[in-house]
Structure formats: structure tokens, C-alpha cells
């Protein structure tokens, strides 16, 4: 209980900061607070539940398929495979369901124009909700294993250095939904799927370098580089779309 409370106290301020930064980009036609709150709740609860269940079932299936030896290397093989290939395939669609619900709901009830910028903001907030719950689970797990060193090590890596990861991934899916709403192209139906594919690729690529390719820390460095590039792209798109909507 102590580690859980401490994790919440440490994670909440950063998630709140990320929330304010993402929302502040869309000042011209800001999304309603209640809808952003629902996005946060979906990411923190709605998307986490199927992700955890699917992840556990998937790891069991991988363990049966790979049939690793009951050694540290065998366990690591299953964990790395799940992180690189399984997690993106489960977590990104789970988060995308929130965006799908927003689209169908807002068609009838919300009158704001949900274009690419709004889609990225909604996706980013859903991702932050997911980060909130996932980071607490990982931080508490590390603390229970190795104490304070595990707590602060995982907190620094996941919440500070990689804290915007899920927000950027799901924002790509949101961009696809936003383009679907505003585009007149015959390919508009494929745009949410393309955004989801980008989200899964970015997610899997980052996890690849932090798992299979984590060679004496080099993989972590590359993971941080990929994360940094994705975050720069994320905010560049947000700013550009924000200026475009004002003009």
C-alpha cells in the first residue's frame, strides 16, 4: 500500500503537466473538459483492463509456442517477444476503441468539429490515462522487488523519460480518425487504420530497442532516441495543426 500511494503521488503531477501541455495547443476550439476527462478515464481504466488480460493470455500462448527453457534467458525471451510484438497489437487497439466511441458519440451529441488536431488531442489524453495506470503498476512492481532503487529507477525511465510514449502513439490513431472526419477522399475509411498501424509500429519499434536490442544500454539509448523523434513529430504536428485551425 505504501508503494502504491507513493507511486500515485509521484506520477499524478507529471501526467497532469502533460495533460495541460497537450490541451493548451488547441486554444482556438478547445475540446470540452468532460470529454477530455472521459478520454483520461478510458485510457486509465477502459483500455488497461483488456490490455492486461490480453497480455497475460498472450504471454501464456507465447510461452507454449516458444517452449523456452525454465531459465532466466527463456523467461526473458517470452517477455521481450511480448513487449515488442504482442503489446502494440493489444494495447493500441484497446486505446483506439475510446476514439471510436468518441466519433460515434460526437456525431450526435457534440457539435465541435473533430478534425485532425482534435483527434490528436483526444488520442494523446487517452494515452496519458494509460500511462498513469501502467506506470504505477510497473513502479510498484519494481519497488516490491528491489525497494526504493527500483521505484525511482522505473519512475525516472518510464514517467519522466518515456512519459509521453503512449500519448504520442495514440495521437497517431487520433490523427487518422480526425482525417477520416474531414477528408473527402475515397480512402478516408482507411485513415484510422493507417493511424493505428503507425501507432503500433512506433510502439513496437521503441520496445524492440529496449528489449531485444538492449545491448549493454545501447538499446535503451536508441529507444530514447526513437522516443525523442516521435515526441518532436507529435508536438510539431500539434503546433502546425493549431496554427492551421486559427488561420
Task: Report each predicted region and the residues it spans.
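Hydrophobic alpha-helical segments at protein termini of multi-pass membrane proteins
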Residues: 1-247
Amino acid at each position: 500500500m505504501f508503494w502504491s500511494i507513493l507511486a500515485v503521488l509521484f506520477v499524478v503531477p507529471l501526467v497532469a503537466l502533460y495533460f495541460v501541455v497537450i490541451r493548451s495547443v488547441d486554444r482556438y476550439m478547445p475540446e470540452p473538459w468532460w470529454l477530455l476527462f472521459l478520454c483520461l478515464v478510458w485510457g486509465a481504466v477502459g483500455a488497461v483492463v483488456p490490455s492486461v488480460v490480453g497480455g497475460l493470455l498472450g504471454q501464456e500462448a507465447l510461452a507454449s509456442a516458444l517452449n523456452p527453457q525454465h531459465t532466466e534467458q527463456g523467461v526473458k525471451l517470452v517477455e521481450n517477444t511480448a513487449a515488442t510484438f504482442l503489446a502494440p497489437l493489444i494495447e493500441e487497439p484497446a486505446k483506439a476503441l475510446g476514439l471510436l466511441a468518441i466519433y460515434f458519440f460526437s456525431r450526435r451529441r457534440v457539435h465541435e468539429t473533430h478534425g485532425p488536431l482534435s483527434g490528436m488531442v483526444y488520442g494523446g489524453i487517452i494515452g496519458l490515462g494509460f500511462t498513469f495506470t501502467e506506470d504505477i503498476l510497473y513502479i510498484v512492481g519494481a519497488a516490491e522487488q528491489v525497494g526504493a532503487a527500483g521505484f525511482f529507477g522505473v519512475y525516472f525511465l518510464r514517467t519522466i523519460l518515456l512519459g509521453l510514449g503512449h500519448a504520442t502513439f495514440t495521437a497517431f490513431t487520433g490523427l487518422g480518425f480526425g482525417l477520416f472526419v474531414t477528408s473527402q477522399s475515397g480512402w478516408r475509411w482507411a485513415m484510422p487504420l493507417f493511424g493505428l498501424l503507425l501507432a503500433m509500429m512506433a510502439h513496437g519499434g521503441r520496445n524492440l530497442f529496449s528489449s531485444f536490442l538492449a545491448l549493454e544500454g545501447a538499446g535503451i539509448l536508441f529507444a530514447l532516441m526513437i522516443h525523442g523523434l516521435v515526441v518532436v513529430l507529435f508536438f510539431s504536428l500539434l503546433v502546425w495543426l493549431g496554427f492551421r485551425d486559427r488561420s
